[in-house]
UniProtKB/Swiss-Prot annotation:
<dbReference type="GO" id="GO:0009086">
    <property type="term" value="P:methionine biosynthetic process"/>
</dbReference>
<feature type="active site" description="Proton donor">
    <location>
        <position position="694"/>
    </location>
</feature>
<dbReference type="InterPro" id="IPR013215">
    <property type="entry name" value="Cbl-indep_Met_Synth_N"/>
</dbReference>
<feature type="binding site">
    <location>
        <position position="604"/>
    </location>
    <ligand>
        <name>5-methyltetrahydropteroyltri-L-glutamate</name>
    </ligand>
</feature>
<dbReference type="GO" id="GO:0032259">
    <property type="term" value="P:methylation"/>
</dbReference>
<comment type="pathway">
    <text>Amino-acid biosynthesis; L-methionine biosynthesis via de novo pathway; L-methionine from L-homocysteine (MetE route): step 1/1.</text>
</comment>
<dbReference type="GO" id="GO:0003871">
    <property type="term" value="F:5-methyltetrahydropteroyltriglutamate-homocysteine S-methyltransferase activity"/>
</dbReference>
<feature type="binding site">
    <location>
        <begin position="514"/>
        <end position="515"/>
    </location>
    <ligand>
        <name>5-methyltetrahydropteroyltri-L-glutamate</name>
    </ligand>
</feature>
<feature type="binding site">
    <location>
        <position position="726"/>
    </location>
    <ligand>
        <name>Zn(2+)</name>
    </ligand>
</feature>
<keyword id="KW-0862">Zinc</keyword>
<feature type="binding site">
    <location>
        <position position="560"/>
    </location>
    <ligand>
        <name>5-methyltetrahydropteroyltri-L-glutamate</name>
    </ligand>
</feature>
<keyword id="KW-0808">Transferase</keyword>
<feature type="binding site">
    <location>
        <position position="483"/>
    </location>
    <ligand>
        <name>L-methionine</name>
    </ligand>
</feature>
<feature type="binding site">
    <location>
        <position position="598"/>
    </location>
    <ligand>
        <name>L-homocysteine</name>
    </ligand>
</feature>
<dbReference type="InterPro" id="IPR038071">
    <property type="entry name" value="UROD/MetE-like_sf"/>
</dbReference>
<dbReference type="InterPro" id="IPR006276">
    <property type="entry name" value="Cobalamin-indep_Met_synthase"/>
</dbReference>
<feature type="binding site">
    <location>
        <position position="643"/>
    </location>
    <ligand>
        <name>Zn(2+)</name>
    </ligand>
</feature>
Length: 754
């Protein structure tokens, strides 16, 4: 029995990659220094994986920004607008990631989307010229040879041709048709080069196969691989899936020329049933994904061994594997000195998951009962308490009316118009303002008890004053307090709610250099005291203008945390919803007129198969949001915000959240969402982001005016809010002030024309 992993986290044990790239962005290091830091990290990771006793060690899973972009660049799928900048390869790569504004031109970044049902974001490759598609990159070969120099025969990992093709945004059908042929030839050439290098295994990741597949999808997949697998020669090909099961294509895969199939037995609800029904091919190896790559709890060896024994009825050719890439979990628990050992023993991050694979391999390869198995089972005895009877009783007492806000949206809109007295096209921001080094230092000093609560509060109050003043000078209509007290929109609430645990170094990559530290939902959740009330009251006291209360919604708190596995996601979410509801009512009672409840991650846990959307998710996720705000008065305006996702297919459900205003991150997706809003007669007022805050470029007044005009062409003017597409926390003040001034100027200019 051997073992394998799909991919390893690339950010480093202490986010070394993030800091190295950010230094390069700030011109504080050279290209050579950045590339050396990246290589050092790769070497460290390979040696770590090798030391842990992993047999199939991945290469080419490392990325400076995003692995989908890496695959696109490998095959020269680069839009002409980036080619025309005439930058070197690295800066062209980063121009696609972040946009570019300089002497060579001014271009926006590629659109960003959620990677399937995770909190990782990938960049959407754009193809306007299929003629240039060819194998022009060499990253996959270089990194294989780097590992080879260390004495490691690695397994290069690459996004498969079918998934890559489905993720590309093509200019038109003609481009798409030509791209199909060119991309196939490029993959064939890739196979040839890997054969020249005498590579043993290539892993092709095809997560798109876990979606509901149409007949056309299956035909396209077969068309690609029937040709491609004829060119594999000595190269062995592992078809790797994750985030679900292969129910639509599994029997066909058994008859294909793949040498191995990677199945997900964690999220693949039907993976085991498929093997039981159809068996497994004698000429193939089964890479069994049984170590959870998306959650942080210790593997129960009894369950894993039971699964393996069942699979061995159908095949003896089994490799122990992770369910997906380990980039979705933190690096290692060895940096967690503050967590009680009773909790920590039940956590397994990426490095610990390597040990689990090693243990399972050893247990399966030994003839008698192994002490490793006994030690694992001991961990699950004396688990710390998780239940709170008061929370259970409160959930039990909920009635149908607790999930419905009255009066209707239409009636509320009239009441709010009279009460709030806002101008046409009201301007606002999403919530956070830049967090400079002194803000972070102040928070850290308070956490480390180096300063008093009074000093901490006074510092933040001064920052809030400055933030309110800046917004008033710019001329925004609805203000925010800036969120200087918050490290992260989810972690902050988790820290102030009972039932959460926190790591010191549990960083996970969200996109590029952005990392998040998800809290752990350990027990029943409740609010023991107000969380944001004092900050909101203070901010509102500084201005005659409305200052929004800012909260994170229950679904986002759940989706951006590591969830419990002992109760349903529905129950966990409703517990959080009741806690946030208490905060909403406190804010309203304190005179806060607009309360924003962000559901940035609403789409994240949406099942990948449409048939499961309602029963497994939307039927409880939408009511949980309703539960948060159903108790407020008609005159209180409820806002929500949603991040990078595709929303067009769940807009009716979003409308059913019954918020008064919703802001979307729509700027990177070219405002295409507006057509759908118009088509379904979306009732909620909307603020489609008018510029992309994930890029350092400052949009001009003309550019913003054009965007606002586009929005006005699609939606009634009374329904529109003007705002950036996300919070401003990661930007510099000079960019923010310049961009917001242009936003207000453009809005005023348009108002005069209406």
């Amino acid at each position: 029995m051997k073992n394998s992993i799909i991919s390893y986290p690339r950010i480093g044990a202490n986010r070394e990659l993030k800091f190295a790239i950010e230094k390069y962005f700030k011109n504080q290091s050279s290209k050579e220094e950045l590339l050396k830091s990246a290589k050092d990290l790769r070497i460290r990771h390979w040696q770590e994986i090798q030391k842990a006793g992993i047999d199939f060690i991945p290469s080419n899973d490392f990325s400076l920004y995003d692995n989908v972009l890496d695959a696109a660049v490998l095959f020269n799928i680069v839009h002409t607008k980036y080619k025309n900048l005439n930058l070197d390869a690295l800066d062209e790569y980063f121009a696609q990631s972040r946009g570019y504004q300089g002497e060579n031109g001014d271009v926006t970044a590629l659109a960003m989307k959620k990677w399937f049902n995770t909190n990782y974001h990938y960049l959407v490759p754009e193809c306007d010229n299929a003629d240039i598609i060819a194998l022009t990159g060499d990253k996959i070969f270089k990194e294989y040879l780097e590992a080879k120099e260390l004495g490691i025969e690695s397994k290069p990992v690459l996004i498969g041709i079918f998934t890559l093709f489905k993720l590309i945004a093509f200019k038109d059908e003609k481009t798409q048709k030509l791209a199909k042929e060119k991309l196939l030839n490029a993959y064939i050439e890739l196979f040839d080069k890997l054969n020249e290098l005498k590579v043993t295994w290539l892993e092709l990741d095809e997560p798109y196969l876990v979606y509901d597949l149409s007949k056309e999808d299956i035909a396209l997949f077969e068309e690609f691989y029937q040709e491609l697998l004829n060119h594999k020669k000595d190269l062995k090909i592992l078809l790797q899936s994750y985030f679900g099961d292969l129910r639509d294509i599994y029997p066909k895969l058994l008859e294909s020329k793949f040498d191995a199939l990677g199945l997900d037995f964690i999220e693949g609800k039907q993976s085991l049933a498929l093997v039981q029904k159809y068996g497994f091919a004698k000429d193939k190896i089964l890479f069994a994904g049984l170590i959870n790559g998306k959650n942080i709890y210790t593997n129960d060896y009894a369950k894993s061994l039971k699964l393996i024994k069942e699979l061995q009825k159908y095949t003896q050719n089994i490799i122990l594997n992770t369910s997906c890439s380990l980039l979705h979990v933190p690096y290692s628990t060895e940096f967690e000195s503050k967590l009680d050992s009773n909790y920590l023993k039940l956590f397994s991050f990426a490095k610990e998951k390597l040990q689990e694979l090693k243990d399972l391999k050893e247990i399966l390869n030994s003839s008698e009962e192994n002490p490793l198995f006994r030690a694992n089972q001991e961990l699950f005895k004396n688990i710390p308490e998780r239940l709170d009877e008061k929370v259970k009783a409160r959930l039990k007492a909920l009635k149908k009316e607790d999930f419905t806000r009255t009066p209707s949206f239409k009636e509320r809109a009239l009441i709010q118009k009279e009460f709030l007295k806002l101008p046409l096209l009201p301007t606002t921001t999403i919530g956070s303002f830049p967090q400079s080094a002194d803000v972070r230092s102040n928070r850290l000093a308070f956490k480390q008890e180096k300063i008093s609560a009074q000093n901490y509060t006074e510092f933040n109050q001064q920052k809030i004053k400055e933030c309110i003043q800046i917004q008033e000078e710019i001329g925004l209509d609805v203000l925010v307090h800036g969120e200087f007290e918050r490290n992260d929109m989810v972690e902050y609430f988790g820290e102030n709610l009972k039932g959460f645990l926190f790591t010191q170094n549990g960083w996970v990559q969200s996109y590029g250099t952005r990392c998040v530290k998800p809290p752990v939902i350990w027990g029943d959740v409740s609010r023991t005291k107000p969380i944001t009330l004092a900050w909101s009251k203070f901010a509102q006291s500084l201005s005659q203008k409305i200052v929004k209360g800012m909260l994170t919604g229950p679904v986002t708190i759940l989706n951006w945390s590591f969830p419990r596995e002992d109760i349903s996601l529905k129950e966990s979410t409703e517990q959080i919803a009741l806690a946030i509801r208490d905060e909403v009512l406190d804010l309203e009672n304190a005179g806060i007129k607009i309360i924003q409840i962000d559901e940035a991650a609403l789409r994240e846990k949406l099942p990948l198969r449409k048939s499961d959307w309602h029963s497994e998710y939307l039927d409880w996720a939408i009511p949980a949001f309703n539960l948060v705000h159903s108790g407020v008065k008609a005159k209180t305006q409820i806002h929500t915000h949603m991040c990078y996702s595709e929303f067009s297919d769940i807009l009716k459900e979003i409308d059913a959240m019954d918020a008064d205003v919703i802001s979307f991150e729509a700027s990177r997706s070219n405002l295409s969402l507006l057509d759908t809003l118009k088509a379904i007669r979306f009732k909620t007022e909307v603020g489609p982001g008018v510029y992309d805050i994930h890029s350092p470029r400052v949009p001009s007044v003309e550019e913003l005016s054009l965007t606002i005009e586009k929005i006005l062409n699609k939606l009634p003017k009374e329904q529109i809010w003007i705002n950036p597409d996300c919070g401003l926390k990661t930007r510099a003040y000079e960019e923010v002030i310049a961009s917001l001034k242009n936003l207000v100027t453009a809005t005023q200019k348009i108002r005069e024309q209406l």
